[in-house]
Amino acid sequence: MIKSPFKWTTTWNGIILSDDNLILPNTWTITFDYNAIDDDLFRRDIAMQRLEYMFEEKFETSIWTNFSNPWVEILYEKMNTFIITLPAEPYDSLIASTALLKAQSITNGVFDFHSCSITSNLGYKVTNVIDIEEAVESNDSMYNEKFSDGPWYVRPDAGFTDILTTQDGDVTLIKDSKDWGDYNLNWDYYDDENIDSLEKYKHNNQKERWIPLIIKGGASDNED
C-alpha cells in the first residue's frame, strides 16, 4: 500500500434524499490521503483552493440523491437548493468514492490521491475507507450511456452534478460544467510566462490558502 505524505480532512453538512423518499440531514467528515507531484507552489495552492471550493461552495448544504430519483427534476425546477446526483443511493461509501474521483480529476497532475476515509452521523460514525483503484472500478461498473464524457465526478471542470429533465417528451441531460477560470482557479494564468511572479501572487492571494509564498510581518487583513 502506498504511504501518503499528506492528509487533508474536512467536514460538511448536507441532506440525503433516499430512494424511499426520506429526507435525512447529515454531517460528514472525510480525510484524503495524497501526494503532491507538482513542484510549482502556485499550482499546489490552486489545487487546494479547488478542493475547498468543492466542499465549501458545492457540497455544503446540498441535497444528495440517486440520479434516477423522480424527485430530482421536481426539486431542480422548484427549489434553489443545489442537488448532487449519484449513480445509486447516496451511502457514505459512494459519496466517498465520487468525492475521491472528483478530487483526483480537478487536481490532476498536481496531486495524486491514494485513498480517502469517511464518517457520518447517520452512519454511526463508522469509518468507510476507499482507495483510488476501488473508486475507479466502482465508476466503471456503473457506466451510464447518457454521459459521453463521464459523470460530473470524473470530469476536470468545476461542475458537481448532472440533472436529467423531461420537457415535451424529450429527455435532456443538464451538466453542471463550469470553467475553473470563472472562479480564478484555472492553471493557465499561472503557466503564462509573460506574467511576473508578483502579479501571480496577487491574483492567487485573493483568497490565500495553504502555502505562504511570502512571509508577512505585522497585522494582516486576510480572513483566512
Task: Describe these PLM feature segments.
Residues 117-157:
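Short, low-complexity, polybasic intrinsically disordered segments
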Residues 184:
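Short acidic-hydrophobic catalytic motif
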Residues 3-19, 33:
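N-terminal intrinsically disordered, cationic/polar leader segments
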Residues 106-120:
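Short, surface-exposed ligand- or partner-binding patches at beta-edge/loop junctions that are enriched
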Residues 17-101, 218-224:
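Histidine-centered catalytic/metal-coordination loop motif
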Residues 6-8, 26-32, 114:
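Hydrophobic residues positioned within well-ordered beta-strands of beta-sheet architectures
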Residues 155, 163-167, 174-177, 192-221:
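Short hydrophobic short-linear motifs embedded
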